[in-house]
Amino acid sequence: MIPIFIIVHNQYEILKKSVESYKKYINTPIEIIFHNVYSTYFETINYLELQKKKGYKVYDSKINDHHTVIDSIKDYIKHHPICEYIVITDPDIELFNVNSDIIEFYIFLLNKLNVQSVGPMLKIDNIPNFYPNKNQVIKGHTNQFWSKPVKSILFKNTNYQYIECSTDTTFQLFSTKNIPKEFPYKNSIRTLAPYSAQHLDWYINPNDLYPSQLFYLNNTTKISHWNNKKWNGKYYNNNINIINNFFINKYKYIYYYNKCKCKNNYNFGDFITPYIYKILFLKDAILDINGGSKKEDVIIGAGSILSSCNSNSIIWGTGFMFGNEKINKPKKILSVRGPLTRNRLLELGIQCPENYGDIALILPYFYYPEIKKQYKLGIIPHYIDKEKFNKIYINNDENVKIIDVTESIETVIKNILQCEMTISSSLHGIIVSHAYNVKCMWIKITDNIGGGTFKFRDYYGSLKINNYNTLLPYIYDKQISTQEIINLINNYPNPTFPINTKLIIEICPFINIKNKIH
């Protein structure tokens, strides 16, 4: 039995395809083992949990470092001392039309040629034209690998070709007595067809992505031939991927509320839709101040701003503020924030699909920094509540973080991620906490928030949570302990994490996503 260690970090569709290829093409008995490198994407997490239930071994790393796979391998060898060989691979290496004795061939080469590892050459003759960096890949791999001398070796009465070159984690077979301490390594070979492989990242169409691919490409700091490249005179890396330069821009007008009476007129929840737009297209959207007065279509997204729509508005995840507004019929409704908003639209004779979800829930697709927990509790007052909150709450607990919603979106996200759990009188404080798998409790500090409780009830309805209640400000007046608040949060209804947000991203009006609902 040959163990195949697959290093996983947020891949899903590609991972499944690679696993299927190993089961299909390898006739040697294998054991597939997953090494999870701090994955945060919900489909990846759920997939790995399912594999555990099926009996597969899943190692979990608490840090995003693929070198941690070495520790997992050492642990495996410790418990399987008779294991002689092991395969280490990234999740995007697919075996395609290879001879089924590939493992047997690799063991033969490893011993015959006395090298540290054996793996496949990556095909470059079938990379599709829609892959933006096709020419760079071909040139780079030709210079690095294909330009090297090709050698032959006889195996089972047939000559097969290989190249002596450095390797990393592209389906590499090792002896368990010679496991590397780090990658890459030089004393290795790569085999040509019929023992080659495909690098699935090179077959991604930027205008026909799976949701998992969008999440992965925007949240991975280094992917071979995708980012860390120079484009338009700038380097885009660390969560802004050069793939975004190739998205087809379907809409350029957005309506969002930008007149809040707070610091710099900036409430982070109001700017979520233009933030997503800029991540996608690396430029600002055009603000339509009237919600659809232009000749071109206007996207209305995050916020309680549905009452601002017009006949050429496209509604994506927005909601009503009060629940009794009358509106112009929009051009199209893709989704709304929750069922209360939908019910009001139906009362007005406007058809609305049962597609729910605030746009803030998909922020992790575009920005998911690695942040260590530093606080037991985060408190997120609505900007309208800030003055009263400062009077009734004195923060003298080093375990508590006060989060300011008038800071930038990325700052608020980072601050929330620093906390083990939160309480919030800001709706988007609650939603963003949930989006990043942080337990949150809705609190009420004043009666001054526009719309009262409608938008909160609308959002909770989208999660099918009905047994919530507001926690009144007396908890501050009595200055109950942080631990008492934590106990309350632990008993407060929260969604099952991670939240399934595929529907919201699949109907994103800005780009084409596979499995898109029309």
PLM feature spans:
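C-terminal catalytic/acceptor-binding lobe
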Residues: G140-I243
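A conserved acidic beta->alpha catalytic loop
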Residues: H35-Y47
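Short, acidic, metal-binding catalytic loop of nucleotide-sugar glycosyltransferases
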Residues: E20-I30
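N-proximal low-complexity "stem/linker" segments adjacent to membrane-targeting elements
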Residues: M1-E20
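Active-site anion-handling motifs in enzyme catalytic cores
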Residues: N241-H518
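Conserved catalytic core of nucleotide-sugar-dependent glycosyltransferases
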Residues: H66-I73, I77, E94-N187
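Short beta-strand-to-loop acidic/aromatic patch adjacent to the donor-nucleotide binding site
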Residues: I82-F96
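Conserved donor nucleotide-binding strand/loop of the catalytic core
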Residues: E49-H67
